[in-house]
Design a protein with these regions (language model features):
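Long, contiguous hydrophobic alpha-helical segments, chiefly transmembrane helices and signal peptides
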Residues: 8, 36-39, 122
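Primarily extracytoplasmic ectodomains and periplasmic/lumenal surface modules that are beta-strand-rich
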Residues: 13-15, 45-50, 137-140
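N-terminal, Lys/Arg- and Ser/Thr-rich interaction peptides
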Residues: 1-23, 34
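Glycine/small-residue-rich interface belts in oligomeric ring/scaffold proteins
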Residues: 18-102
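Internal, well-folded beta-alpha domain core
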Residues: 75-82, 86-262
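Bulky hydrophobic/aromatic packing residues
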Residues: 15, 21-31, 131, 239-242, ...
Length: 262
């Protein structure tokens, strides 16, 4: 067993929520699995959402199976990756800001003057440690590209305005990895359905250093629905509070971090 670890960051990031109104586009508070495998797909040169699906199916010699609901190539090939995401922030999420754009091309808006004002919510200075379980051929290819600093396309954080910086890549071998089942602390994001967050017990010892507790929770995309091509969401949590492993999930101790793959 091997685990690849690397860090990814950027000045800004924008992981668009599909449930938005006309003028303000919101972002998810963290990178999610679909966005992450999209970045990895770009590194490997796989087709994305905007690539002509017909070309993809011709390359696969399955032209007769073309339909509107075929998944992007990166999703087909990488959705089975086991990943863990650890936000490198004080409270599990990142500051956000609103960025305003003017689109003055004539066809952009039916309003007088043809000027469309668009507002986007961006994450500021996001940074994550990413872990990938090396248990299949695609994972091995990704490890080769990341460790050797190779990429077919430039990776970016949700939008091509936000370039991704990938660094500090390393491989952990089996003798550097420990499997846990009863630990009370999880580093990074985990599915809410797998763990129960416990209330902290008060400690009577005055000398114990106080740690400010936090709990970040958000519904994040975990897969794409075959019929609708829309995100399917799961509730994720990131916390420094104690947790109970209620579904007997395997926890991996890698370096100083306890992580859960999904």
């Amino acid at each position: 067993m091997e685990i690849l670890k690397f860090t990814i960051k950027g000045s800004n990031a924008f992981f668009k929520k599909p449930d938005v109104n006309t003028y303000l586009y919101l972002t998810y508070g963290n990178i999610h699995k679909i966005a992450l495998i999209g970045i990895l797909g770009a590194i490997l040169g796989y087709c994305g959402y905007n690539k002509n699906k017909l070309n993809y199916m011709i390359n696969k010699k399955e032209l007769k199976n073309v339909s509107e609901n075929d998944f992007p190539e990166f999703y087909d090939k990488l959705i089975n990756l086991k990943v863990a995401i650890v936000p490198k922030s004080e409270y599990g999420n990142f500051p956000k800001k609103i960025q305003t754009f003017n689109n003055s091309v004539g066809y952009a808006s039916k309003e007088q003057g043809g000027n469309l004002i668009v507002k986007e919510q961006w994450l500021e200075n996001p940074k994550w440690d990413i872990y990938i379980l090396i248990d299949n051929k695609q994972a091995k290819v990704i490890a080769d590209y990341i460790l050797n600093k190779k990429a077919v396309y430039i990776p970016y954080l949700g939008k091509n305005d936000h370039f991704a910086d990938i660094f500090d890549s390393e491989m952990f071998e089996e003798n550097q990895i420990e499997k846990l089942y009863d630990t009370k602390k999880i580093s990074g994001l985990f599915m809410k359905k797998d763990f129960s967050v416990l209330m902290e017990e008060e400690d009577d010892e005055e000398e114990v250093e106080y740690e400010e507790l936090y709990k970040y929770e958000e519904k994040l995309p975990i897969r794409i629905n075959k019929q609708t091509n829309m995100y399917e969401l799961e509730s994720f949590i990131c916390t420094n509070m104690n947790v109970a492993n209620i579904r007997n999930q395997t926890i991996y101790k890698v370096g100083k971090e306890n992580i859960v793959f999904y």
